[in-house]
Structure formats: structure tokens, C-alpha cells
Curated annotation (Swiss-Prot):
Family under the similarity heading: Belongs to the glycosyl hydrolase 3 family.
One GO BP annotation of this record: cellulose catabolic process
Source superkingdom: Eukaryota
Protein's recorded name: Beta-glucosidase
Enzyme class label: hydrolase
């Protein structure tokens, strides 16, 4: 299917036959999902030929060589949930002036801190298809984390990718196309870390739904079918090698290529093995094949073992509530079950990531994520310690950041329908408007309910740890109403979507009836209008569809504004001839109502494009697994690479709106497109250079008595320490049951041609030239590739040359080149 010539971006779609990397660890061929093979040891960091990373490792190793075992463990270990000022806090090494590391939610704002901006979500940002704006947004977000004294942002999100329309957290990501999200991942990594903050790419990998991310026993009994959550383990996402490389791993590869310093592993299993202790995922795919040099941290409570996870490539346990690390990790090193050089590498990766990203916060965080109180006990959760200043109420907002947030929201608005040039509005077209719907007005619970799980009115974000704390929020009713006043247009707002008599009375005499509708998705944190993160269905909330039908039956100029995390069912009203215009957006942040007004009244020309496909039949979307009758739930990704537009293309399914669709208030034409291959593609990739020599760390003191709780030291409740309690209990363990394939022998060079550099091996190339008549063409490549060689694309625009690079796999057989072009307004 070809995309219609509406809009903003030009797409060059290059797809290929996928090939298995035969030198990688292989699972059985009996089942394409089967189980994860093992890969050991964890590749030692700092051995790849990258000057900036090597310099960071050089400095970090100097520090680690001076540390005791307990000091190293302290860096790898969270101190417990809510046991510090940030979302997550590690221990410190005061002797070497190394402070506790502060890691903080979330992707779009400094969650649980005051006086910050709440930016549009990732899905809204990706709708802009504007690389400069995406970079600027990342810089702005990074600057606010820096201003609050956080060391690392727990974001952005590249998993879930949003392959499931009803998935709860798809809005935190950037859509199911791997190239689009990959471009964004690269830009956001550079932007955030330019501010001296660690970027944490999450969630690795296959975390495409919220149901069953944890093992649960009747958690919601009495509210919904208890069997829905009656499981003994978390969901296993079973993904084949081609889909892993061409879809799900791709954005993480681009983040690594951009120098990302931290990656968070996910709650779910991958092919039968928990993601945070999956040696094939962490040791091979991430640290060997992609050459990741930073550190891997767990999602909160995603760890199910200590020694196995550390040997599998995990570097930091957050928040370490179950204490798999802490004193247990110290014990594992002392009794010989965890090699000391693995602990050395864990600590070094953490420190080198901070150095690489330019983190320098000598005063620490100036806020406390547990409370907005100005003063209180230093250990607020335990209510212990001295009375100290908890929140300095530092205002990190700026005119520049607000402008970026506003611009990102404007360019995230997608115009889906505009019959008879209904929009933009103006006094010459309308004298009276009605603003209708519960989703247009204030939420009766405000904007600060727990983890933003409000959902009873207008919304600026989804809910969960990926939300933000609003300093202000403009509802559609306020924004559109204020703009109508400027135009001297009479308006009325009716917020009751259930008793519709007042709304219909208002609409009957209006020149335009504007119905605002939404659905709210988020993290599985509890009941939000009967939804537990993932959406129960793709129907608009708050009785919106009956209201639209009733209003449009009496007003032939009905305008519908839809806000949702991802796709939503538009079929009940989209073909209604009295519904003359439809606007869509994902969650737009603090300026939601202001942005809608700007677009409705023509102050801004809508330029957003859909970062996913909207189906005609909701049954064509990949479903969320909602109920299981087995204790160990499995999600087989049988669609493989055929997600979103790939699926609709392959199976010739009808769609309502294509990936990349979006109208504007202008008309354009395109002519004389020419594609030339100037250089044949070579399938012979050159291997990357061998790794530098393995670093030999100084051995720490192995006397258990050195690591007991210091005499007179008072331990806080619910706080994790690196100490052991009984030195006499430490005995050498020569019978530990290591996994199959376990080894401590480091490789001299890349395991396969796919490995050897940041984001993969970049050694072979192809040149394609596009000659375009129009000077204002934006080109975006969407390439279904494995991760290895270099592909150079040169774009000629009126004699101006723009070159960009991308990676591919050895033996990349190109089977088709499809040019899909859109004009930039």
C-alpha cells in the first residue's frame, strides 16, 4: 500500500531478507521462540575502540582500583524503595567523594518534583517527524533534570514500542516503526546527555503490555476476574531472532550508537528467561553485539536472583527492596560464586557512565520525590534523621523550555479530516460555538492524583511513573474558550457527557459543535476507570461516542478532537458527513488546551503525522493478553516483523489512516522524482578491530571481617546496605550451580561480524541518491535491517547535500525499494 501524498515527511522504505547471524549463540531450531541460549562472560567495558568511552573507563578504573568490595557493591545497589530523595538512590563512597547516585522518573518531566515543565509525551513528539525539535525537547528535559540535581533520567522509553494498540504505556514510546524510533533514540540520547545527565533507555525488551508483567496472586480479587492475574511468574515475551533485530532491538542499537550511558531491563521474561538475568540479551545482544559500554539497571523490583543476574550482565539493582544485591552480593564475591572482576566491571561501568555523560552534582538533588514539604526528617520514609531542607523549590522552568514544550505539542497535532475546509475557524465562519464533553474540562480530582491516575476530565499525560507533576495545565475548554473570546465568538462549555440534554440544546444553535473525547492509558498501578494500565478496549471514554452521534444528528458542523495514548476506534463516527473535522493527538502535556486553540483557529498550520496505522477493524490490532489459564503466561510474537503497516501490507488489510498520514491547511504538489543507485551494495562486511587488552583490576581485601556492620552503626529500617552480619558464615563455595555455558574467559575480539562498535559494526556501504525538484523536502528513511554495516544516503536538494548514516547486516540482500514521499509544508 502506498501512503497518500499528504504532508510532512518523505519516506524511503528499504526492506531486506533477514538472515540469522550464524556465529551468534543459537537456540534449538525445533521452535522459533524456544528459549534464550546462554552467553558468558559479560564483556568487560572499555575495550571497544571509542576514545571518549575509553577515557571515561580510564578514570573510572583508577577509582575502582581504590575501592573495597563493600564500596563497589554500594554503587551497584539501590538503598531501598523511597529510602532517599529520588525515585532511586544508590549507596555512596564518601572516602572517594562519590555521592549517592540519584536516578529519577520520568521520560517527559521530573516526576514528583515541583516547578518543572510537563512536556508532550514520546508518542506526541514522534508525530512531529521533526528531528531538530525532538533533539531540542531532549535538551530541555535534560536541563530540568540537571537543574533539580538528578544524575540520571529514567527514560526515554523505547520499549514498549506500541505494537499493541491497547498497550498501557505505548504513549511513553514513539511508535512501532523501528527506524522512526531509532532516529529519535539517537537524537534524544545526545540531547539529554549534553546537559550532564545520564539517559536511561528503557525497557529492554518485549515489554509490550502491562498485564502479567509481575507474577500476581489475585491482586485485584473482588474488582475483576481474579484469575486474570493468578500467575506464578511474569509474562514471557517470545520473540524470534529476525523480529528482535529488525524491530525491537533497533531503537536500543541507535541509543547505544548515540552513547547512551544506561539501559533499564524490563519486568517480563524474554524467551523464558527474566530479562534482567538473561545472559543472551544482556551479555550477547546488548554488550557484545551492540557494544554497549554503559550500565544495565533493573526496573523497580524486576530482579529474581543476585549471582545469576550479575553474571548475566546486570550492573545495578533498583531499588533493591528484595536485597538480591547489597550484602548478598558482598557475600557472593567473598565466597567466590561471583568473580571479583565482574563486580569490578559493574562498578566501573557505572562510574564511567557518569563520567562519559558529564554528571557533576556536588550538592546532590535539591528536591525530595517523596514529599513536597520544605523541611522534614532526612530519611523521610523512615521518619528518622535530622530535620533538614528536603525541597529547595528550585524553579527549573525557562522561557526556552516552555517554548520547546509548546512547539512540540503544536507539531504533535494530527489533522485527520477536514471536509469543506471547516478548519481553521474564524469569525467569518462562525459566530457561536459549543465546547462539549467531559474530556474538555477540569478533572474533578485535579491533576495531582496518585501517579496521575485521574482520568475524569482533560488529560495532559497518561498515568504511572512516566507522568509528570503539572505546574499548570490548560484544558481544552479554557484554551478554546479564551481564543474564542479574542475573536469575539460566543461560546458555551457543557462538560456533562452522560446527561446530554444540555449539550444538545447548546449544539442545536451553534455554528460549530466541538466535541472533545479521550481515552487514558498508563502503567499497571491500579484501577483507573476499570482499566489496569492496558486499555480494556479501544472505545473513547466518558460516553463520548453516543454524544458525538447525538450532537452530529442536530449539528452539521461537528468537530471531534480525540486524545489517546495510541490508536483508538474512530469507525463509529469518522464517515458521518456531519462530522466535518477530526483532530487527533497523543498526550500533549501542560499546554494541551492552548495548542488545540492555536490549531483550530489557524494560528498554527497542523503538520503532525501518525506514527502508527489506524485500522478500520480493531480486531486487526495485535491484542493484549488479558486472561490466562496457566501459571506461567506466554506471549508468542508470532507476527514476527509484521507489525503495524508491515502487517496491513502483508495481509492486505484495509486501514482507515496510514502510518505517516496527516493533513494540513495547505495544498502541495510533487513531481519528477528520480532514484539512482550510484554504487552497488557489497555483502562482504569487514570485521571490526579486535578489542583492547583486558584490564586487570587490583584485588580487594577478601577478609570477611572487613565487611561486617561497623561497630556502633545504626541500621535504618527498609534500607539496603553492603554489609554482612556474620563473617564466620562466609565459606568458599565450590559447588555453585552455574548456568550451562558459563565461562569467565574474555574474548579477544568481536564474536561475530555484527559486533565491534557502538550500536554494531559499521564497515560496509551503499550510496543512493534522490533528486527532488522541491527545495523543502524532508526525507526520513525507514529501513528494515539487521544491525551491522553502514548505509550512506545522500539527499540532493537544489544542489544542497545532506548525508546521513545507518547500520545494516553483512549479506544485506535488498529485495525492494519503495519510495513514499510527502511534501513538507
Amino acid at each position: 500500500m502506498l501512503l497518500p501524498l499528504y504532508g510532512l515527511a518523505s519516506f524511503l522504505v528499504l526492506s531486506q531478507a533477514a538472515l540469522v547471524n550464524t556465529s551468534a549463540p543459537q537456540a534449538s531450531n525445533d521452535d522459533p521462540f524456544n528459549h534464550s541460549p546462554s552467553f558468558y562472560p559479560t564483556p568487560q567495558g572499555g575495550r571497544i575502540n571509542d576514545g571518549k568511552w575509553q577515557a571515561a573507563f580510564y578514570r573510572a578504573r583508577e577509582l575502582v582500583d581504590q575501592m573495597s568490595i563493600a564500596e563497589k557493591v554500594n554503587l551497584t545497589t539501590g538503598v531501598g524503595s523511597a529510602s532517599g530523595p529520588c525515585s532511586g538512590n544508590t549507596g555512596s563512597v564518601p572516602r572517594l567523594n562519590i555521592s549517592s547516585i540519584c536516578v529519577q522518573d520520568g521520560p517527559l518531566s521530573v516526576r514528583a518534583a515541583d516547578l518543572t515543565d510537563v512536556f508532550p509525551c514520546g508518542m506526541a513528539a514522534s508525530s512531529s517527524f521533526n528531528k531538530q525539535l525532538i533533539y531540542d525537547r531532549a535538551v530541555a528535559i535534560g536541563s530540568e533534570f540537571k537543574g533539580k540535581g538528578a544524575d540520571a533520567i529514567l527514560g526515554p522509553v523505547y520499549g514498549p514500542m506500541g505494537v499493541k494498540a491497547a498497550g498501557g504505556r505505548g504513549w511513553e514510546g514513539h511508535g512501532p516503526d523501528p527506524y522512526l524510533e531509532g532516529v529519535i533514540a539517537y537524537l534524544q540520547t545526545i540531547g539529554i546527555q549534553s546537559q550532564g545527565v545520564v539517559s536511561t533507555a528503557k525497557h529492554l525488551i518485549g515489554n509490550e503490555q502491562e498485564h502479567f508483567r509481575f507474577a500476581k496472586k489475585d491482586k485485584h480479587a473482588g474488582k475483576i476476574d481474579p484469575g486474570m492475574f493468578n500467575t506464578s511468574s511474569s509474562l514471557s515475551s517470545e520473540i524470534d531472532d529476525r523480529a528482535m533485530h529488525e524491530i525491537y532491538l533497533w531503537p536500543f542499537a541507535e541509543a547505544v550508537r548515540g552513547g547512551v550511558s544506561s539501559i533499564m531491563c524490563s519486568y517480563n521474561k524474554l524467551n523464558g528467561s527474566h530479562a534482567c538475568q538473561n545472559s543472551y540479551l544482556l551479555n550477547y545482544l546488548l554488550k557484545e553485539e551492540l557494544g554497549f559500554q554503559g550500565f544495565v539497571m533493573t526496573d523497580w523490583g524486576a530482579l529474581y536472583s543476585g549471582i545469576d543476574a550479575a553474571n548475566a550482565g546486570l550492573d545495578m539493582d533498583m531499588p533493591c527492596e528484595a536485597q538480591y544485591f547489597g550484602g548478598n552480593l558482598t557475600t557472593a564475591v567473598l565466597n567466590g560464586t561471583l568473580p571479583q572482576d565482574r563486580l569490578d566491571d559493574m562498578a566501573t561501568r557505572i562510574l564511567s557512565a557518569l563520567i562519559y555523560s558529564g554528571v557533576h552534582n556536588p550538592d546532590g538533588p535539591n528536591y525530595n520525590a517523596q514529599t513536597f514539604l520544605t523541611e522534614g526528617h532526612e530519611y523521610f520514609k523512615q521518619q528518622e534523621g535530622d530535620i533538614v531542607v528536603l525541597n529547595k523549590h528550585v524553579d527549573v522552568r525557562s522561557d526556552i523550555n516552555r517554548a520547546v514544550a509548546l512547539r512540540s505539542a503544536v507539531e504533535g497535532v494530527v489533522l485527520l479530516k477536514n471536509e469543506h475546509e471547516t478548519l481553521p475557524l474564524g469569525r467569518e465562519k462562525v459566530k457561536r460555538i459549543s465546547i462539549l464533553g467531559q474530556a474538555a474540562g477540569d478533572d474533578s480530582k485535579g491533576t495531582s492524583c496518585s501517579l496521575r491516575g485521574c482520568g475524569s476530565g482533560a488529560i495532559g499525560t497518561g498515568y504511572g511513573s512516566g507522568a509528570g507533576t503539572f505546574s499548570y495545565f490548560v484544558t481544552p475548554a479554557d484554551g478554546i474558550g479564551a481564543r474564542a473570546q479574542q475573536e469575539k465568538i460566543s461560546y458555551e462549555f457543557i462538560g456533562d457527557s452522560w446527561n446530554q440534554a444540555a449539550a444538545m440544546d447548546s449544539a442545536l444553535y451553534a455554528d460549530a459543535a466541538i466535541e472533545v473525547a479521550n481515552s487514558v492509558a498508563g502503567e499497571e498501578i491500579g484501577d483507573v476507570d476499570g482499566n489496569y494500565g492496558d486499555l480494556n478496549n479501544l472505545t473513547l471514554w466518558h460516553n463520548a461516542v453516543p454524544l458525538i452521534k447525538n450532537i452530529s444528528s442536530i449539528n452539521n458542523n461537528t468537530i471531534v478532537i480525540v486524545t489517546s495514548g495510541q490508536q483508538i476506534d474512530l469507525e463509529p463516527f469518522i464517515d458521518n458527513e456531519n462530522v466535518t473535522a477530526v483532530i487527533y493527538s497523543s498526550y500533549l502535556g501542560q499546554d494541551f488546551g492552548t495548542v488545540l486553540a492555536k490549531v483550530l483557529f489557524g494560528d498554527e498550520n497542523p503538520s503532525g503525522k501518525l506514527p502508527f496505522t489506524i485500522a478500520k477493524d480493531v480486531n486487526d490490532y495485535i491484542p493484549v493478553i488479558e486472561k490466562v489459564d496457566v501459571p506461567d503466561p506466554v506471549d508468542k510474537f508470532t507476527e514476527s516483523i509484521y507489525v503495524d503497516y508491515r502487517y496491513f501490507d502483508k495481509y492486505n488489510k484495509p486501514v482507515r489512516y496510514e502510518f505517516g498520514y496527516g493533513l494540513s491547511y495547505s495544498n502541495f504538489s510533487l513531481s519528477d522524482i528520480e532514484i539512482q543507485t550510484l554504487q552497488p551494495f557489497s555483502e562482504n562486511a569487514e570485521p571490526a578491530a579486535n578489542y583492547s587488552e583486558t584490564y586487570q583490576y587490583k584485588q580487594s581485601n577478601m577478609d570477611p571481617s572487613e565487611y561486617t556492620v561497623p561497630e556502633g552503626f545504626k541500621e535504618l529500617a527498609n534500607y539496603t546496605y553492603p554489609y554482612i552480619h556474620d563473617a564466620s558464615s562466609i565459606k568458599a563455595n565450590s559447588s555453585y550451580d552455574y548456568p550451562e555455558g558459563y565461562s569467565t574467559e574474555q574474548l579477544d575480539g568481536p564474536k561475530s561480524l555484527a559486533a565491534g562498535g557502538l550500536g554494531g559494526n559499521h564497515t560496509c556501504g551503499m550510496l543512493v541518491t534522490l533528486s527532488l525538484l522541491k527545495s523543502q523536502i524532508k526525507v526520513l528513511m525507514l529501513v528494515g535491517l539487521h544491525l551491522n554495516c553502514m548505509l550512506d544516503i545522500q539527499i540532493m536538494m537544489n544542489s544542497q547535500h545532506l548525508q546521513c548514516n545507518y547500520v545494516d547486516l553483512k549479506r544485506c540482500f535488498w529485495i525492494k525499494i519503495i519510495l513514499k514521499l510527502f511534501l513538507l509544508n
